[in-house]
């Protein structure tokens, strides 16, 4: 079986070798673990964001960035593009932010290959029938703080590997790399909703592709959380090849997937978050989805699409002004 950790290791090694070119910093902790700072004390870069995203996806996706990406020629933004032939494993088995890493005063949302070793969360891996048994653990952390030896020891213990084989990549939400990797979740937003909200067997998704604009760095982590989510919710477009079974209602799946199916659709995400008193659990989970979903049903040959991009909300979210 494919190992998302082993598939990602050469990408990590490439980042280490190109640290100056990528504007990142590599730190060797006293216990032997390796930390890649991709935006805490460094600038980072689009290329670092691309590689960070590819690692989040377990090395099982092609990731590209188009600087000339546009939405209806009304607002020009960089766009990140994702393609994967292993959608369930890459997005839910690796990229999903399914590990809340809390050690002492340190907290970060963890995603990427190491989750498949720690089985975080176990239910997801049972649903997609996947596990990894690599001897190296690679975890991507969304945090404005760098992890220390205690965090690395915790990850090593949960993953069952020697701490010297732990690699921790860190990028704050309010950073170039952070913005790229969150927009790079455009495909995962769809597969996550398929599984968690619509209870569709994501193993039937045989190929997936997506594109989403990348948010400019407009403020602190809270402001960027709003902006980065809006890039996917109102600008993300996805394409799924699904091999359905007889009895699967793929048209209903397609209509139910996009963010426009949520009651809170039409507002910038930060406004929705404020209205929920900053409590994620009070937010309609249906909003966490791409703006447009296109599905090709391989069994019936049907092609269908639902949803639309909403440039006006993106402009409002970014407080954009045309000079």
UniProtKB/Swiss-Prot annotation:
Function: Catalyzes the reversible interconversion of 5-formyl-H(4)MPT to methenyl-H(4)MPT(+).
UniProt KW keywords: Cytoplasm, Hydrolase, Methanogenesis, One-carbon metabolism
Superkingdom of source: Archaea
InterPro entries: METHMP_CycHdrlase
One GO cellular component term noted in the UniProt record for this chain: cytoplasm
Family: Belongs to the MCH family.
Biological processes, Gene Ontology terms: methanogenesis, from carbon dioxide; one-carbon metabolic process
Keyword Cytoplasm applies: yes
Record's protein name: Methenyltetrahydromethanopterin cyclohydrolase
UniProt-annotated location(s): Cytoplasm
EC number: 3.5.4.27
Swiss-Prot/TrEMBL catalytic activity: 5,10-methenyl-5,6,7,8-tetrahydromethanopterin + H2O = N(5)-formyl-5,6,7,8-tetrahydromethanopterin + H(+)
Principal subcellular localisation of the protein: cytoplasm
EC primary class: hydrolase
GO MF terms held by the record: methenyltetrahydromethanopterin cyclohydrolase activity
HAMAP family: McH
Pfam families from the UniProt entry: MCH
Pathway named in the protein's UniProt entry: One-carbon metabolism; methanogenesis from CO(2); 5,10-methenyl-5,6,7,8-tetrahydromethanopterin from CO(2): step 3/3
